[in-house]
Curated annotation (Swiss-Prot):
Keywords: Acetylation, Cell projection, Endoplasmic reticulum, Fatty acid biosynthesis, Fatty acid metabolism, Lipid biosynthesis, Lipid metabolism, Membrane, Phosphoprotein, Transferase, Transmembrane, Transmembrane helix. This is Very long chain fatty acid elongase 5. The modification Phosphoserine is found at residue 285. The modification N-acetylmethionine is found at residue 1. Pfam families: ELO. Catalyzes the first and rate-limiting reaction of the four reactions that constitute the long-chain fatty acids elongation cycle. This endoplasmic reticulum-bound enzymatic process allows the addition of 2 carbons to the chain of long- and very long-chain fatty acids (VLCFAs) per cycle. Condensing enzyme that acts specifically toward polyunsaturated acyl-CoA with the higher activity toward C18:3(n-6) acyl-CoA. It is found in: Endoplasmic reticulum membrane; Cell projection, Dendrite. Its main location: endoplasmic reticulum. Its EC number is 2.3.1.199.
């Protein structure tokens, strides 16, 4: 295993250049194998979990879901606030920011982005809860692709470009996750569900996040600095793939639901009209049947 890891490190160095020494020795970052193994285990559970649960009763998980979602809401809020203050203190350039230009502020960003990387491992639990509760319809291609890819992408980001221009997407994503996990946490409480109105806007926010990240990343291509261009091109490509998947998810989830509701409403309206017409027509029948013929006067 050590020989394989050494060979892998040599390959990565030839492909991507030397690693950033500031994260040397950090948990899970020295060696890619643990991240890769976690991802493989995740995909195996996605595949085998629903099969295992097929003939079993779903678990409620309500109590642990409240705690889990509250924890991720607070972690996301912490990361968002720390990234915003770190960028402000380091006077980061929106258009392009190198990885070694802001001193201690760069280190603050790196520490927060490690938590961001680690949170992607924690978020595997999203899928596991879907499986345990038998909500398999929520395990979409978008869901699995996003969860499995983010952990691996951020392992590479943390080892080669752990600050600088890498901050933007993580900052937006942390803010979106504050909204998303607070929604999921509150929806675990049945009495709160009638008051939760912002689910649709979370998906819109995720789409907007991807578009804004492409715009900000493209600025680094148009007005380059010391941040490696290859990472920027990769970021743009990845965001385009997410936009395609999120757009498809949005259309499938909301436009079709809206069309279905309109169709049901029209059907109900037509049925109601027929009932009214039939009622009106039939209402004369008893009256007509009850009319007695007048007797002719016999004067």
């Amino acid at each position: 295993m050590e020989h394989f890891d050494a060979s892998l490190s040599t390959y990565f160095k030839a492909w991507l250049g030397p690693r950033d020494t500031r994260v040397k020795g950090w948990f899970l970052l020295d060696n890619y194998i643990p991240t890769f193994i976690c991802s493989v285990i995740y995909l195996l559970i996605v595949w085998l979990g629903p099969k295992y649960m097929r003939n079993k009763q779903p678990f409620s998980c309500r109590g642990i879901l409240v705690v889990y979602n509250l924890g991720l809401t607070l972690l996301s809020l912490y990361m968002f606030c720390e990234l915003v203050t770190g960028v402000w203190e380091g006077k980061y350039n929106f258009f392009c920011q190198g990885t070694r230009t802001a001193g201690e502020s760069d280190m603050k960003i790196i520490r927060v982005l490690w938590w961001y990387y680690f949170s992607k491992l924690i978020e595997f639990m999203d899928t596991f809860f879907f499986i345990l509760r038998k909500n398999n319809h929520q395990i979409t291609v978008l869901h699995v692709y996003h969860h499995a890819s983010m952990l691996n992408i951020w392992w590479f980001v943390m080892n080669w470009v752990p600050c600088g221009h890498s901050y933007f997407g993580a900052t937006l994503n942390s803010f979106i996750h504050v909204l998303m996990y607070s929604y999921y946490g509150l929806s675990s409480v049945l009495s709160m569900r009638p008051y939760l109105w912002w689910k649709k806007y979370i998906t819109q926010g995720q789409l907007l996040q991807s578009v804004l990240t492409i715009i900000q990343t493209s600025c680094g291509v148009i007005w380059p600095c010391t941040f490696p261009l290859g990472w920027l091109y990769f970021q743009i490509g990845y965001m385009i793939s997410l936009i395609a998947l999120f757009t498809n998810f949005y259309i499938q989830s909301y436009n079709k639901k809206g069309a279905s509701r309109r169709k049901d409403h029209l059907k109900d309206h037509q049925n109601g009209s027929k009932a009214a017409v039939n009622g009106h027509t039939n209402s004369f029948s008893p009256l007509e049947n009850n009319v007695k013929p007048r007797k002719l006067r016999k004067d």
